[in-house]
Swiss-Prot record:
Heme c binds at residues 13, 16-17, 79. PANTHER family: CYTOCHROME C. It holds the Pfam family Cytochrom_C. It comes from Nitrobacter winogradskyi. Keywords: Electron transport, Heme, Iron, Metal-binding, Transport. It comes from the Bacteria. InterPro entries: Cyt_c-like_dom, Cyt_c-like_dom_sf, Cyt_c_1A/1B. The lineage of its organism: Bacteria, Pseudomonadati, Pseudomonadota, Alphaproteobacteria, Hyphomicrobiales. The keyword Metal-binding applies. Binds 1 heme c group covalently per subunit. This is Cytochrome c-550. GO terms for molecular function: electron transfer activity; heme binding; metal ion binding. The keyword Iron applies.
Amino acid sequence: GDVEAGKAAFNKCKACHEIGESAKNKVGPELDGLDGRHSGAVEGYAYSPANKASGITWTEAEFKEYIKDPKAKVPGTKMVFAGIKKDSELDNLWAYVSQFDKDGKVKAK
């Protein structure tokens, strides 16, 4: 995916999510270190029971399936988002989001 295009795609997520070194929980949890993170793992965020019980470890495949249709992947999620259907946009969004480590720093390539 294209990181710059993914950064632009992330504008759809910014109403509820932050990412990067100053990221904080908002309507949704901050997304630093998402690649390999377990669902329901961010301290101080009140997840839905469905999300906590989902047992997801976020990988590229899990992320794309979820972002395409959150309520189909995790029935009962409180994430209110219609989803992103275009594979190219999902590729770019994952390229952007997955580059941040748990401290919000861009990982060395």
